[in-house]
C-alpha cells in the first residue's frame, strides 16, 4: 500500500508535467501540494516499511548509542513532547523536506520535473530511509547557491551545520573550491575524463583513500571493512557496469556534449556537472565497499534533481525530453522498490 501511494503520486506528477503551460503560479501551487503530501507520507509512515526506521527506533531507546548530537537532541524533544519515536520522524521530515523543496525551487526552472526526480529516487533513499542524511543533503542543496556565488565562508558554515546531522557531510568540504563560472577547456577535459579515470582505478583496484591522511576517513573505512569481513554487510564488490549507473553516465555525457548549446539557459549547469562528476568518482573509488560507494555517491548525486531536467533544453520537441525524464524516473523507482527492496508493501 505504501509503495502504491508513492507510485500513484509519481504517476500524477508525471502526467501534470505534460500540461505545463508556463504558468508559474499554478506550477508553484502544484509543487507545494506535492511537497506537502511527501511530508505526510514520510512523517507518518509505518515503522519497518523501510530499511532504517527500526534501527532509528532502537537508537531512540538507547541514549548511549554513538550518533550525531542532533539525533540525541531531536530524540529528547520527541520524548518530551510526544513520548514516542514518531516525533523523531516528524521532526526530521520537517527539517529536510521544506528546506530541500525550497532549495530545489530556487535552483531549478522546472520544479515539477525536479520534484518528480526527487520523489522517484532520492525521496526513497533519504527522506524515507536515511533521515539524518536527508537533512544533511537538504542543507547541501541550500548551500550550492553560496558556492555558485563564491560565498565560500557561508558555504562552509552551512556544511558544518550539515555535519552535526550526518558526519558524512565532511564529503562536501572539498567542494568549496568549485565555482559556477563557465566551463574552461581544462574543466571540460576533466569532466570528460573523470568517470574514465574512476573506472581505470576501480578496475586496477587502486585504493587512493589509503593516502588520505584524515582520521575520520581512515576510521570509517576500517569500520566498514571489519563489518564487511564479518559478513554484517554486503561483501561483494559493486558491479561498476550496472545498467542504472551506465544510464546516468549516458545522461551526464549527453548534457556535457550539449553544454555549449544550453549553458545560457541552464544557470547552474557548470557547478552541477562538476559535483556530478565527483559523485561518479566516489562511486567508482569506493566500489570495493558497497555501503560507502552508494551512500557517499548519492549524497553528491542529489544534484541529479536539478541537472537531469536540463534535458528539456537539449532535446526537441520538449515533450520528448519530458518523456525521457519520466521513463528514467520510473525505471529507477521500480529498481529501488522491487529489485533493491528499499521499501516494503506492508509491515508484518
Model-predicted regions and their roles:
Residues 54-58, 66-72, 181-294, 342-343, ...:
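Alpha-helical transmembrane segments and terminal signal-anchor/GPI-anchor hydrophobic tails
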Residues 91-107:
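Transmembrane-helix motifs of polytopic, lipid-linked glycan transferases
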Residues 140-154:
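Membrane-interface transmembrane helices that cradle and orient dolichyl/undecaprenyl
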Residues 104-120:
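Transmembrane-helix signature of polytopic, membrane-embedded enzymes
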Residues 128-134:
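Short acidic/glycine- and proline-prone juxtamembrane loop motifs at membrane-interface regions
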Residues 192-196, 316-335:
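Signature aromatic-anchored transmembrane alpha helix within multi-pass, membrane-resident enzymes
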Residues 123, 154-178:
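Membrane-interface alpha helices of multi-pass inner-membrane proteins
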Residues 1, 17-93, 337-348:
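TM-lumen/periplasm interface segments of multi-pass membrane proteins
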Amino acid at each position: 500500500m505504501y509503495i502504491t501511494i508513492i507510485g500513484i503520486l509519481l504517476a500524477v506528477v508525471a502526467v501534470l508535467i505534460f500540461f505545463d503551460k508556463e504558468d508559474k503560479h499554478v506550477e508553484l501551487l502544484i509543487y507545494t501540494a506535492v511537497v506537502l503530501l511527501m511530508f505526510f507520507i514520510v512523517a507518518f509512515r509505518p515503522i519497518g516499511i523501510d530499511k532504517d526506521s527500526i534501527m532509528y527506533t532502537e537508537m531512540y531507546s538507547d541514549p548511549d548509542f554513538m550518533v550525531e548530537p542532533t539525533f540525541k537532541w531531536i530524540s529528547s524533544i520527541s520524548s518530551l513532547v510526544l513520548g514516542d519515536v514518531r516525533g523523531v520522524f516528524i521532526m526530521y521530515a520537517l527539517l529536510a523536506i521544506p528546506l530541500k523543496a525550497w532549495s530545489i525551487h530556487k535552483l531549478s526552472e522546472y520544479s515539477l520535473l525536479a520534484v518528480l526526480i526527487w520523489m522517484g529516487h532520492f525521496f526513497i533513499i533519504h527522506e524515507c530511509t536515511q533521515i539524518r542524511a536527508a537533512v544533511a543533503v537538504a542543507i547541501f542543496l541550500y548551500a550550492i547557491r553560496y558556492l555558485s556565488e563564491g560565498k565560500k565562508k557561508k558555504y562552509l558554515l552551512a556544511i558544518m551545520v550539515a555535519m552535526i546531522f550526518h558526519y558524512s557531510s565532511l564529503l562536501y568540504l572539498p567542494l568549496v573550491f568549485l565555482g559556477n563560472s563557465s566551463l574552461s577547456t581544462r574543466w571540460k577535459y576533466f569532466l570528460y575524463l573523470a568517470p574514465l579515470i574512476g573506472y581505470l582505478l576501480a578496475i586496477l583496484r587502486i585504493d587512493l583513500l589509503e593516502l588520505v591522511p584524515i582520521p575520520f576517513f581512515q576510521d570509517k573505512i576500517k569500520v566498514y571493512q571489519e563489518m564487511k569481513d564479518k559478513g554484517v554487510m554486503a561483501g561483494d564488490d559493486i558491479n561498476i557496469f550496472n545498467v542504472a549507473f551506465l544510464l546516468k553516465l549516458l545522461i551526464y555525457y549527453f548534457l556535457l556534449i550539449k553544454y555549449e548549446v544550453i549553458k545560457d539557459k541552464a544557470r547552474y549547469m557548470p557547478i552541477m556537472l562538476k559535483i556530478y562528476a565527483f559523485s561518479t568518482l566516489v562511486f567508482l573509488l569506493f566500489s570495493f565497499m558497497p555501503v560507502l560507494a552508494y551512500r557517499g555517491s548519492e549524497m553528491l548525486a542529489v544534484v541529479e534533481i536539478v541537472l537531469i531536467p536540463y534535458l528539456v533544453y537539449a532535446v526537441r520537441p520538449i515533450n520528448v525530453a519530458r518523456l525521457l525524464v519520466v521513463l528514467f524516473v520510473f525505471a529507477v523507482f521500480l529498481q529501488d522498490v522491487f529489485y533493491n527492496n528499499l521499501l516494503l508493501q506492508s509491515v508484518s
